[in-house]
Amino acid sequence: MLHFFLPKDLQPIFEYIPSSALHVVGWSSVLPSIITVGRRLAFDEGKHEMIGNLTPMLPPHVQFSTEHQHDHHDEHEHAEHAHTGLIHAEHIGDSVADKERFGVTVLEVFFSQLFSEAGFFIDLREHGFSLNSETVFWNPPNLWYHLDHNFRTGLIKVYDGYFFGPFSYAEEGLADLGILTEDHAANQKVVDLLLSHFGSDGERNVLFEIDPFAKSFDQFFSYLKEKNISLDANFMYFGLYLVTLYICLDKLKVPLDARTAFLNARNRLTKEKPDSQEEPAVS
């Protein structure tokens, strides 16, 4: 039933949201926001303002662009852009170096947007990106959402505690997300199910594959259902954001270092290191 309310651009993404999520997320609270997100897309509401808010958050070599459209491109257009040195990410070719550069850039964009108080563009799929030898251009569809402050900063704590420790910092983040339990082992399992595909301290470079991720995402929601933990609309939109990341990076088929991408975003966008146990400050 939910698919009837979804914007067309969201429907392929929702295919990777497991049915177990229906039992965990309160869909009655989600439906109004889906209508709002769909209206933004249909009428191009707020995109200019979002670009203005997010431009300072992006890595220095990434620029928003309305000139490099996210539609699928014909051969003539592809040839013209090849002549000028600009290629669409869908046609990135077989160069491992180019794939790594693009993939790490998308990861850093993913993490950078989590530091934005203003909201984030949901869709990181490759058809929104173009690149040349110096710059990655991004023209995302106008699918954006504003995460609640505590949820957003909780995500940052979870990633920080997972990548760098201590795990108690990740548990603080779980509390902000509303999924902290009294069982330390259960908290570890929740984090592992959600983040293990990002690699760990002992495994920096990992392949981002959509099918294994979708399986662990299902296990994540099933585990929360078993523990009678409920989630709200924030997690649904973050889940969609994760899915678009994996859809994009899955096509590259090269190992990527998410830990360093997070570190780069954190160092650019926070005034204090989180080991002070204070809430990260957004510049």
Placement of each model-derived feature along the sequence:
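Helix-rich C-lobe and terminal helical cap/extension of kinase-like folds
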Residues: L2-S283
